[in-house]
């Protein structure tokens, strides 16, 4: 017996049967071992018996019983599974005869299945005959699956029913109601139909950005074929979506991938144009399966595409089409391009309205129309790195999923009460052990409290269950309507007019009426009482999801946030002392943005802060970041002194192609792409190279910039703050009593205009002059720094108080108008914090003690009280 005459699957089956015999401690490999392996591991054997309508469960039981009857030989030196039984040897010889009769080149699985029908006194043969299965029926099933093919290679079983194995029948999926409806895209579908109707080169390729609906167009064509809304030439055709991944997966041996693809193409060719092959991500066929000396999938398709034997529809993105298909000119010319543009917001709303019912049925929720409009408009405005309608559909889907999860989870109010009951029950069990009067009194009170909580929990639970049941009932009725509509469509397509009339005028209206009654009843209950569960998806839910994805707050203002925004200026005044104009302008810009009346095409605000060092320019940016985001992490700080050379400018938007760091992206663009809602602080802009400002022109004017990767980065939700020391000497010399005169402002502006180009300055919203700090301002800053020190010491449970004399002395000693507030910090560190630290380390100041800091003869004194 020559094993080379067997297909690889048969060889593997014999090897697995041998392993089974060894594991079972059987001396010989029997027919039962082989068929046990075939029925568990061979898809082909299972498929043959399915087509022949064999009860495989009963067959497997017979095989198990046969294996149990084989005697187990134990002991040392016994060779298990080293020989074939006489019955198996006979089966192999009969299989070779079957191979010769069918004129095949190799013995394959089907020959074993046929050969077992001729075995005498074999339990498997007896069981098949008991099921009234003759060899003729099994042979017919095999020939049906083979589809006229012969076994010409050792991978023959892999190539039977290749389209079923490696593809999905989209038309069958439409008929079974698995695909979502396709709304719009009529022009593109008509274009595809026109190309498919050509004599040669009838292969459209859909090209568009990811998420614009390329695959949906093919699904729309499948739906039209089912509705017979296509020209005569396309009626009754089938669209098979080819899965390149499963075609390549598991092709271990050289030439196996080509054989599989050849089998697919052969089946398409034999269909005489009845099968349209749809290859999603068609760029994957270029180079697919290419190994040393092998031909890739693209080259195998070319001859059939050119002759018009293969109707192929491709879909790929613009970038991948350019990268893969355009490079292969011979392949490109065999396809006709169909460009799929991104739909408008209005078209997206229509698409969402078409999908609304499907989402409602799947999630069991009720979607408001304003939620669909919000999903289209908010995704278009805030999610700029993805495309409509995909991003809008994802928003609606996630909002529905959020509501569904809340419906299925235990409500937080009920959860709290249930936990309280559990806590009281534990306490009750502990108190029952105690016998003293106080414990008994406490137990009595606790039991009354527990009874109240249990009653409340039971009421809430029953209310939750009833609300959940109502929602489930509505969902079931919606599913029923969807099922009936699908039946109606099927009846109309099959011209079953009696059934169609019964559905259209009888069953569907009755179920729709039931749904309306249930929804009305639900609304009535909602109006009358507070409901635990919410099943409505409104624009607020959509806005929440947008906020979660992007970090941009787009929800309607809640009361707490209104207060926070209205008091923003006051809070900033406390953090940044002495710069009232700057604080007011910045807080007004944030207020306009959050109220939704800012220009949607520009950043929230762009400012240049001018002033001497240490007056609060950077501090204001930090305070704003902390107030808007509760942390300074959302502040993107870029020190412009790092961008003094011409070549360093490209670091902002990313290195150009061919340079190191190209893949990493720019320092500014990547930071904003990750956090689109943030404060961008460009510190010391006068130190940057002039070319930096050319990059900033588009950011300030249109709120957008393209990075080195070609991605559009959105700056429309950023506050851009630039700081500079230009004109600080004039501000220091000529500021009188903390006020800046109009003449001084004009002189500073002239210096600024000589430093920066007019087109840059013209795009900035406001140029704010920071005044040098007065002694009164410095006293206010001392208060702030002392408060910060008190917060730091609170961790060690030490409280400090500083007398007014000491504070005034610190302000006078550390005040220097040239350096602003920074010397103040240094003075406090040197004269207050360092002596304090020495006292703490030496053990003179212990935790839980108070320290009074006073002034005596221009020296600080520390009085410690426990």
From Swiss-Prot:
Residues 393-527 form a coiled coil. The keyword Chaperone applies. It comes from the Bacteria. Residues 3-148 form the Clp R domain. Residues 773-866 are annotated as: C-terminal. Homohexamer. The oligomerization is ATP-dependent. This is Chaperone protein ClpB.
């Amino acid at each position: 017996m020559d094993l080379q005459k067997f297909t690889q699957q048969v060889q593997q089956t014999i090897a697995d049967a041998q392993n089974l015999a060894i594991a079972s401690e059987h001396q010989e490999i029997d027919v039962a071992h082989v068929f046990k392996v075939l029925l568990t591991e061979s898809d082909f054997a299972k498929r043959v018996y399915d087509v022949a309508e064999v009860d495989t469960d009963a067959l497997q039981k017979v095989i198990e019983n046969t294996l149990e009857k084989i005697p187990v030989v134990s002991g040392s030196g016994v060779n298990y599974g080293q020989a074939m039984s006489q019955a198996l040897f006979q089966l192999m010889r009969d299989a070779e005869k079957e191979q010769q009769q069918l004129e095949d080149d190799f013995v394959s699985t089907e020959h074993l299945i046929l050969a077992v029908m001729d075995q005498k006194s074999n339990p498997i043969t007896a069981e098949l005959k008991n099921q009234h299965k003759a060899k003729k029926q099994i042979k017919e099933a095999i020939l049906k699956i083979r589809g006229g093919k012969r076994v010409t290679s050792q991978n023959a079983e892999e190539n039977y029913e290749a389209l079923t194995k490696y593809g999905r029948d989209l038309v069958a999926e439409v008929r079974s109601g698995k695909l979502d409806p396709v709304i719009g895209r009529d022009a593109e579908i008509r274009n595809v139909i026109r190309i498919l109707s050509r004599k040669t080169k009838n292969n459209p390729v859909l090209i568009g950005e990811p998420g614009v609906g390329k695959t949906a167009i093919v699904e729309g064509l499948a739906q039209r074929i089912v509705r017979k809304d296509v020209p005569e030439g396309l009626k009754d055709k089938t669209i098979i979506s080819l899965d390149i991944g499963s075609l390549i997966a598991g092709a271990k041996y050289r030439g196996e991938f080509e054989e599989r693809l050849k089998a697919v193409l052969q089946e398409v060719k034999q269909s005489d144009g009845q099968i349209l092959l749809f290859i999603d991500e068609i760029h994957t066929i270029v180079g697919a399966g290419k190994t040393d000396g092998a031909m890739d999938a693209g080259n195998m398709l070319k001859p059939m595409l050119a002759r018009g034997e293969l109707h192929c529809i491709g879909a790929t993105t613009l970038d991948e089409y350019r990268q893969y298909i355009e490079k292969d000119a011979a392949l490109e010319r065999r396809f006709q391009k169909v460009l799929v543009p991104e739909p408008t917001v209005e078209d997206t709303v229509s698409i969402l309205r078409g999908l609304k019912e499907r989402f409602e049925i799947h999630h069991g929720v009720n979607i408001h129309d304003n939620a669909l409009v919000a999903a289209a408009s908010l995704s278009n405005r805030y999610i700029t790195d993805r495309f409509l309608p995909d991003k809008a559909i994802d928003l609606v889907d996630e909002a529905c999923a959020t509501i569904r999860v809340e419906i299925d989870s235990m409500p937080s109010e009920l959860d709290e009460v249930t936990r309280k009951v559990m806590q009281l029950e534990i306490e009750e069990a502990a108190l029952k052990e105690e016998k003293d009067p106080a414990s008994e009194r406490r137990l009595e009170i606790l039991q009354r409290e527990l009874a109240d909580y249990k009653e409340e929990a039971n009421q809430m639970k029953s209310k939750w269950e009833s609300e959940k049941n109502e929602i489930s009932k509505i969902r079931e009725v919606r599913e029923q309507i969807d099922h009936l509509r699908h039946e109606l469509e099927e009846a109309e397509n099959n011209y079953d007019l009696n059934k169609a009339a019964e559905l259209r005028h009888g069953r569907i209206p009755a179920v729709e009426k039931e749904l309306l009654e249930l929804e009305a009843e639900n609304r009535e209950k909602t109006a009358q009482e507070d409901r635990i569960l919410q099943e409505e998806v409104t624009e607020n839910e959509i806005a929440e999801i947008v906020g979660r994805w992007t970090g941009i707050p787009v929800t309607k203002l809640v009361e707490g946030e209104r207060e926070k925004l209205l008091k923003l200026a006051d809070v900033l005044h406390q953090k940044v002392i002495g710069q009232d104009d700057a604080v007011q302008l910045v807080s007004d810009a944030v207020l306009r943005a959050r109220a939704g009346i800012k220009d949607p095409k520009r950043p929230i605000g762009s400012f240049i802060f001018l002033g001497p060092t240490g007056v609060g320019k950077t501090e204001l940016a930090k305070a704003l970041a902390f107030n808007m985001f509760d942390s300074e992490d959302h502040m993107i700080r870029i020190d412009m002194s790092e961008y003094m050379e011409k070549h360093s400018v490209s670091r902002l938007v990313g290195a150009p192609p061919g340079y190191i760091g190209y893949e990493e992206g720019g320092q500014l663009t990547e930071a904003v792409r990750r956090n689109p809602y943030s404060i961008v602080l460009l510190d010391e802009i006068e130190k940057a190279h002039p070319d930096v400002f050319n990059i900033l022109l588009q950011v300030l004017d249109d709120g957008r910039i393209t990075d080195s990767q070609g991605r559009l980065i959105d700056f429309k939700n950023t506050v851009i703050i630039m700081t500079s020391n230009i004109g600080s000497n004039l501000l220091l010399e000529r500021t009188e009593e903390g006020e800046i005169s109009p003449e001084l402002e004009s002189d500073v502006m002239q210096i600024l205009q000589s430093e920066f180009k007019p087109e840059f300055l013209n795009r900035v919203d406001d140029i704010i002059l920071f005044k040098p700090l007065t002694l009164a301002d410095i006293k206010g800053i001392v208060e702030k720094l002392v408060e910060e020190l008190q917060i730091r010491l609170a961790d060690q449970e030490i409280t400090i108080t500083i007398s007014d004399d000491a504070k005034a002395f610190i302000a006078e000693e550390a005040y220097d108008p040239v350096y602003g507030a920074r010397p103040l910090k240094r003075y406090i560190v040197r004269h207050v914090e360092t002596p304090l630290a020495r006292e703490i380390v030496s053990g003179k100041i212990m935790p839980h003690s108070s320290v009074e800091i006073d002034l005596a003869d221009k020296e600080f004194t520390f009085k410690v009280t426990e």
